[in-house]
UniProtKB/Swiss-Prot annotation:
One of its GO terms (biological process) is embryo development ending in birth or egg hatching. Keywords: Cell cycle, Cell division, Chitin-binding, Developmental protein, Disulfide bond, Glycoprotein, Proteoglycan, Repeat, Signal. Residues 1-17 form the signal peptide. Residues 58-115, 211-268, 524-578 form the Chitin-binding type-2 domain. It holds the Pfam family CBM_14. Gene3D superfamilies: Chitin binding domain, Glycosidases. It comes from Caenorhabditis elegans. Required for polar body extrusion during cytokinesis in embryo development. Affects cortical granule size. Has roles in meiotic chromosome segregation, osmotic barrier function and polarization in conjunction with cpg-2. Binds chitin. This is Chondroitin proteoglycan 1. GO terms for cellular component: external encapsulating structure; extracellular region. Glycans are attached at S50, N268. It comes from the Eukaryota.
Length: 584
């Protein structure tokens, strides 16, 4: 006898600790007839569940269906039955359970309350403005009618926000109330009742006859007919109609949509099978049983006089859809053209044109200049790397012994500047590091008038030659960084750049033309191989390699040593002990 009440109290306390919803267990079954036996509830019961209105509650759910049941006419509590288990629930705040809407409602909207609480003897207002207790879960004293069966449950002390669960002693252990599990969250939150009826029977799904084509087939894709653009996808015995893009047919072997010429079933390449539309069934025609191309029928109605907008003829009311390409008929007096599908190949035939072959022989690039009338013209054959310059009124004369002539080794890019008499010309040649022009005699000698000192500079990069007439001093400055050319006003200057093609220049009429032929000389080694000194204790020295001589400069602070054939400090050179040369 003692174990069952203790177990009941333990279950109540466990459920309270699990859910902890305020007001959930405020008013458990009210079976006592005394005021103290009902407890204070939330501290503001407004006379709803006080000892004055305590009534006997039928909590037996063994004979009830799952659902919600009202406890009294105007009560904030209600009973829930689920699987034969009963639970008493409390409405939030000052709400009353309304069985009409199966939810908690304000008392003035519940017919059983008539606008006032159930206790008609009470004079309290329907909506009190203040509460009477501070602790909403004040402990309730136990009251028993049979002292021998009383079970004393010690009061629990907790630091949590929720007070211990009230214990009630019952005289009938069989009518113990289980622990509630939930309560409504809002005044109008409906509680879905539990039903114990049989589950709703599955309604049979009616499918069209076309779905039977996948019965017994494995999941996959299947052609809907021979040489058809429609095919079906089977999944779990159900058919999904599908269609290839325009002008393509489904190849079941490769499971792709391809041109009809590549599909083995389309033997004639046109996609049309023999036989009429009346003798063709949907399964054998390769088309879906409906004109829309899918496994269902659309209800769209098209008038008979509305022409089809597709590129092939399609009967509107018939179930057969012709394959394409098909025959298309236009208005009367227009011939009908049946076009079978063929690859789009365009063949163009051009008239025969006799092919003419022209063979052009190689001609050297010879530049010919024709002068005015009465001027003899001289054409010079192509000789590479020869520049011919004709000066007016200058006779060809061999330079006398006392006329110095200097000829340098021929190097590319020679620029020649010619000025008239008594005009001093200064030409500054751009500086090139560690390269000095070497003068070699008897190479491509150029002869000028008698008593005219001529300096002919062989071709070398960025070196300019200045030639003046008699009694005109010419100054050639060594390498410097800037090139400055000064020419007096009204004096024509002719600059002839190097070109591999011979250019012939002729003067005006009545002017005799002199052609200087290219003079061929045998090259004589102009230098001794190796490095040699130019002067004692000098930073400059000459170096001859393969007959080509160049002048080099030692690094700063070093001088050329003839004994060592290299640049060395001055204290290692005997010539430097006598005289120290410093160049600026």
């Amino acid at each position: 006898m003692t174990l069952k009440p203790v177990l009941l109290a333990f279950l109540v306390a466990s459920a309270y600790a699990q859910y902890g919803v305020a007001g959930m267990y405020e008013n458990l079954p009210l079976e006592t007839t005394t005021l103290d036996g009902s407890g204070d509830g939330s501290g503001a019961d407004n006379g709803f569940v006080s000892g004055a209105d305590a009534v006997a509650i039928d909590t037996d759910c063994s004979t009830k269906e799952d659902g919600l049941y009202a406890i009294g006419g105007c009560s904030p509590q209600f009973l829930t039955c689920s699987g034969g288990i009963s639970r008493i629930m409390d409405c939030p705040a000052d709400l009353i359970y309304d069985p009409r809407i199966v939810a908690c409602e304000y008392s003035y909207n519940v017919p059983q309350c008539g606008g006032v609480p159930q206790d008609v003897t009470s004079t309290q207002e329907a909506y009190p403005s203040e509460e009477t207790t501070v602790n909403p879960y004040a402990p309730v004293e136990e009251a028993t009618t049979t002292p021998a069966e009383d079970v004393t449950v010690p009061e629990e002390t907790t630091t949590e926000a929720y007070a211990p669960v009230d214990d009630y002693s019952t005289t009938t252990p069989a009518e113990d109330v289980p622990v509630p599990v939930e309560t409504t969250a809002s005044p109008y939150a409906p509680i879905v009742p539990y039903t114990t009826g049989a589950p709703a029977a599955d309604e049979p799904v009616t499918r069209s006859a076309v779905t039977k084509s996948c019965v017994g087939k494995a999941d996959g894709f299947y052609s809907f007919g021979e040489c058809s653009d429609h095919y079906t996808a089977c999944s779990n015995g159900y058919l999904i109609p599908m269609q290839c893009p325009a002008r393509l047919a489904f190849d079941e072997a490769r499971v792709i949509c391809d041109y009809v010429m590549n599909v083995p079933e389309c033997t004639n390449g046109s996609g049309n099978d023999e036989g009429s539309a009346d003798e063709t069934t949907p399964e054998s025609s390769g088309e879906m049983p409906y004109s829309n191309g899918y496994g269902y029928e659309e209800t769209t109605t098209v008038a008979e006089d509305v022409p089809s907008t597709k590129d092939y003829a399609e009967p509107i009311a018939a179930a057969y859809v012709a394959r394409y390409p098909s025959e298309k008929t236009t208005a009367e007096n227009v011939p009908t053209t049946t076009i079978g599908y063929e690859p789009e190949v365009v063949e163009t035939t051009a008239p025969y044109v006799e092919e003419t072959t022209t063979t052009v022989g190689y001609k050297p690039e010879v530049e010919e200049t024709t002068t005015e009338a009465e001027v003899p013209t001289t054409t010079v054959g192509y000789e590479p790397e020869i520049v011919e310059t004709t000066a007016p009124y200058v006779e060809e004369t061999t330079t006398a012994a006392d006329v110095p002539s200097t000829t340098a080794v021929y190097e590319p890019e020679v620029v020649e500047t010619t000025t008239e008499a008594e005009v001093p010309t200064t030409t500054t040649v751009g500086y090139e590091p560690e390269v000095v022009e070497t003068t070699v005699p008897y190479v491509e000698e150029t002869t000028t008038a008698a008593d005219v000192p001529t300096t002919t500079v062989g071709y070398e990069p960025e070196v300019e030659e200045t030639t003046t007439e008699a009694e005109v001093p010419t100054t050639t400055v060594g390498y410097e960084s800037e090139v400055v050319e000064t020419t007096a006003a009204d004096i024509p200057t002719t600059t002839i750049g190097y070109a591999p093609i011979v250019v012939e220049s002729t003067t005006a009429a009545d002017v005799p033309t002199t052609t200087v032929p290219a003079e061929t000389t045998t090259e004589v080694p102009a230098c001794v191989e190796g490095a040699t000194a130019i002067e004692p204790c000098s930073q400059h020295y000459k170096n001859c390699v393969n007959g080509q001589e160049a002048i080099f400069i030692c690094e700063n602070g070093l001088f050329f040593s003839p004994e060592q054939a290299r640049c060395a400090p001055a204290d290692q050179i005997a010539e430097c002990h006598q005289t120290t040369v410093q160049y600026y």
